[in-house]
Amino acid sequence: GKIDYLFQEQAYQMQNLSIDSMAFSVFDIDILEGSNEFLNLNSRKVAITRRAAQRMFGNESPIGKEIYVSYNPTKPLTICAVVSEWPEHSNFNYDFIDRCYPNDRWGSSGWQTLVRLQENVSSEAFAEKIAKMVIDVPDSNNWQLKDWIATPLTQLRYDHPIANTKVKFQHVVLFAIAS
């Protein structure tokens, strides 16, 4: 989500993406400069896109710069990498990338899980199998994936948008004119 990143007492509202190392095998993210230390658990390191680095630091290299996040202004984060950005029309926009932290509590719903299926696997059959899974959770009546939605990534933006988009009357008029 959007976070206020602080540098030299100036706030920059930026989009954050928390990932694990498998994201590099699924998505086209390149480390252009620096290291992948931002993927280490508890490293306090982050990666920044070229566009965000230009906005915050101008032509200076961002590597090694310490920044803060507004919700934790006493513990610095160190920029250790510059990464490529995606086109702006994406469900997963980002200015900064950091490591997602595992949450082993059942029912935790702070993450989206993306799965890459092999070419010969039916997405419908996969979704049916997952929906029928019952997970044995100690001290509970088991747990089932009730709100499971399987959507091809290419259709996600249209079928299940992540952001709550507010459509204004002007949008309706523009689409009516365009059609």
Which sequence ranges carry the predicted segments?
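Glycine-rich loop motifs involved in handling phospho/adenylate chemistry
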Residues: 37-41
